[in-house]
């Protein structure tokens, strides 16, 4: 079973979209196996976005991502990395299809509601930055045998 890292950004939290977004993923059949709510420490942001540290847009992005609380969580399911990326929609909301999270809710490319890992390798890296192994919970959903067998 594959896992991915997802983060609802400050604009998504402040607009009251956490429940709606979580419902979309759960309704798709994915399982939430970890979650944290709060304002990110700058050291976590620097680790998470280390590939962007030297880029000119990084200070503004860092200021935004630490401007309010985020909800970070780990989803588990078959092909979860690629499916979550499709459900999120294009990074630029003007290019995101209606019905996707960004197509329905994002207001700008800078404030686009949600982040998700772009590959299984990135997911493992990001999960390791935000969660300890002990924080990842294994359990069986009542309907899981019907979804994955």
From Swiss-Prot:
Binding site for ATP: 9, 57, 85, 91, 102, 112
Top-level taxon: Archaea
PROSITE patterns reported in the protein's UniProt record: NDPK_LIKE (PS51374)
CDD domains associated with the record: NDPk_I
Pfam families membership: NDK
Matching InterPro entries: NDK-like_dom, NDK-like_dom_sf, Nucleoside_diP_kinase
Annotated SMART domains: NDK
An MF annotation (GO) of this entry: ATP binding
EC number: 2.7.4.6
Protein localization: Cytoplasm
Alphabetical UniProt keywords: ATP-binding, Cytoplasm, Kinase, Magnesium, Metal-binding, Nucleotide metabolism, Nucleotide-binding, Phosphoprotein, Transferase
Major enzyme class: transferase
Gene3D superfamilies with a match to the protein in the record: Nucleoside diphosphate kinase-like domain (3.30.70.141)
Biological process annotations from GO: CTP biosynthetic process; GTP biosynthetic process; UTP biosynthetic process
Residues at the active site: 115 (pros-phosphohistidine intermediate)
Gene Ontology cellular-component terms listed: cytoplasm
Cofactor(s), names only, from the UniProt record: Mg(2+)
Catalytic reaction(s) noted: a 2'-deoxyribonucleoside 5'-diphosphate + ATP = a 2'-deoxyribonucleoside 5'-triphosphate + ADP; a ribonucleoside 5'-diphosphate + ATP = a ribonucleoside 5'-triphosphate + ADP
Cited function: Major role in the synthesis of nucleoside triphosphates other than ATP. The ATP gamma phosphate is transferred to the NDP beta phosphate via a ping-pong mechanism, using a phosphorylated active-site intermediate.
Family of this protein: Belongs to the NDK family.
Protein name per its UniProtKB record: Nucleoside diphosphate kinase
Organism: Methanocorpusculum labreanum (strain ATCC 43576 / DSM 4855 / Z)
């Amino acid at each position: 079973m594959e896992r991915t890292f997802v983060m609802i950004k400050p604009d998504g939290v402040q607009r009251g979209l956490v429940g709606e977004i979580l419902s979309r993923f759960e309704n798709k059949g994915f399982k939430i196996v970890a979650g944290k709510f709060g304002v990110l420490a700058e050291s976590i942001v620097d680790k998470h976005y280390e590939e962007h540290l030297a880029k000119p847009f990084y200070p503004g992005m860092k200021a935004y991502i630490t401007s309010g609380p985020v909800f970070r969580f780990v989803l588990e399911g078959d092909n979860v990395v690629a499916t979550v990326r499709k459900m999120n929609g294009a990074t630029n909301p003007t290019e995101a299809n209606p019905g996707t999270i960004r197509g329905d809710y994002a207001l700008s490319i800078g404030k686009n509601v949600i982040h998700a890992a772009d590959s299984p390798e990135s997911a493992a890296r990001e999960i390791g930055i935000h969660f300890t192994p002990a924080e990842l919970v294994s359990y069986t959903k009542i309907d899981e045998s019907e979804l994955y067998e």
